[in-house]
Amino acid sequence: MSVSELSTSTQNYLKVIWSLTEWSAEPVTATLISKQTGLRMSSVSDAVRKLAAQGLIVHAPYGSVELTEKGRGYAVDMIRRHRLIETFLVETLGYTWDEVHDEAEHLEHAVSDYLVDRLDKLLGHPTRDPHGDPIPTADGTVPALDACRLTDAGAGAGAAGTTVTVERISDSDPTLLKFFEENGIVVGAVLTVTEGAPFSESLDVKVDGAKNSVPPVSYTH
């Protein structure tokens, strides 16, 4: 069965579960899904039961939620759709990187597998989207990204003066993306850590001579 045959709700839940595991090592729970989606716990709990009944996740009562092999395959298909659409919107239609997430959220449920493959070919089989996120291949392989959180790169003694290259930035906050772009903090930018904040996840960095404070939404190497 193609991922296109799943309901929009099921597609969304699988994608959210995948995304949560991609950005954090924290176990995924119904509570975390509720927080991420803004949906009521009762709705999430019902959805989790249905996903488990379909063999798409494994869920222990009051425990973590894990994708099965089948569920992972569908989730990766949705991630592939989303990131290829974002790339198409930026590279072909001239969208800015802060505009594409919500557009892709709508379009990813409507496109066919055939159209997704055509987009992939048209774009030259890109491996990363405009935010630096890896784009899964047609066979479900997710390209590895050798990077760590900026706050990890700037942690510890002697962090000040560390130079890093931005590899990836979360697209969860369009306003923050716009701020980053206006200040030259984009994928591929070289940053110098000027000061770490031991009791905060933010870091002070310098890019092209200008200083900025950066929250923990970017990955670097």
Give the location of each predicted region:
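Ordered, amphipathic secondary-structure segments that act as subunit-interaction surfaces
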Residues: H82-V116
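Conserved small/polar residues in nucleotide/adenosyl-binding loops
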Residues: T220-H221
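Key DNA-contact positions within bacterial/archaeal DNA-binding proteins
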Residues: S42
